[in-house]
Amino acid sequence: MSGRFIVLDGIDGCGKSTQLDHLLGWLPGSGLMPAGAELISTREPGGTPLGRSVRELLLHTRAEQAPAPTAELLLYAADRAQHVERLILPTLERGDWVISDRFSGSTMAYQGYGRGLDRQLIDQLERIATAGVQPDLTLWLTLPLEESLRRRQGDQADRIEAEGQVFLQRVIDGFAAIAEQRQWSAIAADRPPEAVSRALERELMDRLG
């Protein structure tokens, strides 16, 4: 594989979508990408046609039809396996670049730390679903819980976001532990979007340049 795989991760409200859009415009002219390489934007869950159906099951199902915690974990793994095999791996093998809104770290943070599911099981499922494909760089947008809640006031929460503050704090703590274990790049997101964008650009130049 000669392409590069970049992931933006963090809790809801941290600005992943805004910064992903910025990087889609910035990266092709940054000098980091080889001439002729394409930049593909994707997300988890929902980066493939099958994944979009899984996303609806995971995030927008009525309470009485919501998956149980272990079923939820397996659905995320199925989405990821399809995503890697049908989109991420073929793109990297062509020499193109992939930038994704979330990847396997989110599953460990939300299902492992947030829900308290068996982390060894999550690791096993990750190895199966990713087939060894891992990001070249994960950019973790850090945000305190209070700021996440403030930014999302008035927004319609999906099923995971609606779990409550104690759950979300466990997720934040999980992200911090995972970031240290996996040597992610932590970028403070509690500042104006333009400042976050400049910090991301510097980190990409330092790590991939």
UniProtKB/Swiss-Prot annotation:
A Gene Ontology cellular-component term: cytosol
Catalytic activity: dTMP + ATP = dTDP + ADP
Binding site residues for ATP: 10-17
Keyword Transferase: yes
EC number, UniProt record: 2.7.4.9
One Pfam assignment: Thymidylate_kin
Family: Belongs to the thymidylate kinase family.
Job of this protein: Phosphorylation of dTMP to form dTDP in both de novo and salvage pathways of dTTP synthesis.
Protein name (database record): Thymidylate kinase
Organism: Parasynechococcus marenigrum (strain WH8102)
